[in-house]
């Protein structure tokens, strides 16, 4: 966990329906590739394990990653998307708040709010865009037909020279490859998407793409 010399901002949340404690932590330099990761445990004192069952107290590089620098089209994008807090809305919904820095200079810090959802195997994921207070609704397969932008959140590929866990003075801009960029895909009505196929489970509201 110390491969990039910065690991901080722990936050623990209990999810009573799943009976799990979730530990959210922030990795990497706060102005650039700052990102949130999560692990879970049956007990608040741990041990906490990652997606692959690895104890996060080890020095491996743990996943899953919930937020990392990203950019959709027609927007300059965000960096420094970490240092989170968790909110229990009291009605079965959960939200994550964290900082975000407007690219490309990454100087202006803004507050991001994202809704937290849980996968069928008990892992939290967050909304790809900031929460806008819209009412929840269900979708049909027909609703999803059309062109979409998809972003894959993944490990920042570059290693920086750091000082006290932070980037060196004057190196606050993101470098090539450090920001996840959106790619356009078209979900066709016949269930194809490029060379792959897609399907949508209406009951679970779950989109599946098979390559």
Over which residues does each language-model region extend?
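Carbohydrate-active catalytic/glycan-binding domains of CAZyme proteins
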Residues: 1-211
């Amino acid at each position: 966990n110390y491969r990039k010399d910065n690991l901080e901002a722990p936050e623990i949340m209990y999810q009573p329906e799943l009976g799990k404690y979730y530990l959210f932590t922030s990795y990497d330099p706060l102005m650039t590739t700052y990102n949130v990761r999560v692990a879970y445990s049956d007990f608040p004192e741990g041990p906490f394990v990652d997606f692959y069952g690895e104890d996060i107290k080890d020095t491996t590089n743990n996943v899953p990653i919930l937020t990392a620098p990203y950019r959709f089209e027609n927007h300059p994008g965000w960096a420094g998307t970490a240092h989170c807090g968790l909110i229990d809305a009291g009605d079965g919904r959960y939200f994550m708040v964290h900082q975000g820095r407007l690219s490309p200079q990454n100087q202006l810090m803004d507050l991001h709010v994202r809704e937290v959802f849980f996968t069928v195997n008990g892992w939290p994921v967050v909304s790809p865009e900031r929460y806008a207070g819209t009412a929840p609704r269900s979708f049909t397969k027909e609703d999803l037909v059309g062109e979409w932008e998809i972003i894959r959140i993944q490990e920042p590929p570059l290693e920086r020279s750091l000082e006290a866990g932070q980037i060196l003075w004057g190196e606050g801009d993101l470098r090539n490859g450090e920001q996840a960029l959106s790619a356009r895909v078209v979900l066709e009505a016949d269930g194809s998407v490029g060379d792959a196929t897609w399907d949508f489970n209406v009951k679970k509201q779950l989109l599946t793409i098979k390559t």
